[in-house]
Amino acid sequence: MQTRNTFFWIKEQMTRSISVSIIVYVITQTSISNAYPIFAQQGYENPREATGRIVCANCHLANKPLDIEVPQAVLPDTVFEAVVRIPYDMQLKQVLANGKKGALNVGAVLILPEGFELAPPDRISPEMKEKIGNLSFQSYRPTKKNILVIGPVPGQKYSEITFPILSPDPATKKDVHFLKYPIYVGGNRGRGQIYPDGSKSNNTVYNATAAGIISKIIRKEKGGYEITIADASDGHQVVNIIPPGPELLVSEGESIKLDQPLTSNPNVGGFGQGDAEIVLQDPLRVQGLLFFFASVILAQIFLVLKKKQFEKVQLSEMNF
């Protein structure tokens, strides 16, 4: 009887442990995969400010290049590609939240004109699906289907992101017209330096919050430092906490100034933004243009034939 009770107790404990592990995994993976888009989505109603600045730049302080490629013109109710390229050196490693080094990830926000939206899966061609890979796009807001976000995703695999876009049809959407429209995009590689609440991440430089002499440096067991700065005039002490990740640049007994860097800047990533233009083309206008070209070509042909006929008449008159 006691053996059976022991068996059931062990089985119950193992079940609990497995359940807890699964819950922790799901929570951590969800928070990691959704972290970057959620920061912007929760803090800003619109990712593009009135100045034209995309809000992701508030957390990703370094400026890096970015490129977007879209067709010059598209017809209504057609699927096309918007390709966003986020270039960086694939050999670089970034500081992770735990202070260790790891590969960079990338993310992007694509701001389309009103009426443009993510193409439904049944409208995407097999060739385009192959370019998209396993990426999962989402709308910035349920009411803002024209603003798409993605990331963070592995940068080594997705430094080039293909968005499948469906163009609107003015025949069914009266607020859409055949015009030239702007498209805005922002993209980051690597982690940010500032969180939305204004606090620093461990992926940035830490400066001295007071001037004086470093009286003590304590290396923490889980990484990072605790630096005590003593004011030379009154002996007042200020403690600076450095998280795991940045490398220390100062030592005990060193005299430092206010805002002097205490650590190196470990950031190797950055944010970039760009824009492009696309024309929603009227099919009737295209047909009219083709008809015009055809009429010009026919006119040229008739002109050549008429000229040859006139030359024959002249030649026959001369022979006569």
Curated annotation (Swiss-Prot):
Keywords: Chloroplast, Electron transport, Heme, Iron, Membrane, Metal-binding, Photosynthesis, Plastid, Signal, Thylakoid, Transmembrane, Transmembrane helix, Transport
A single BP term in Gene Ontology: photosynthesis
Subcellular location: Plastid, Chloroplast thylakoid membrane
Entry annotated with the keyword DNA repair: no
Family: Belongs to the cytochrome f family.
UniProt-listed PANTHER family: CYTOCHROME F, PTHR33288
Protein name in the entry: Cytochrome f
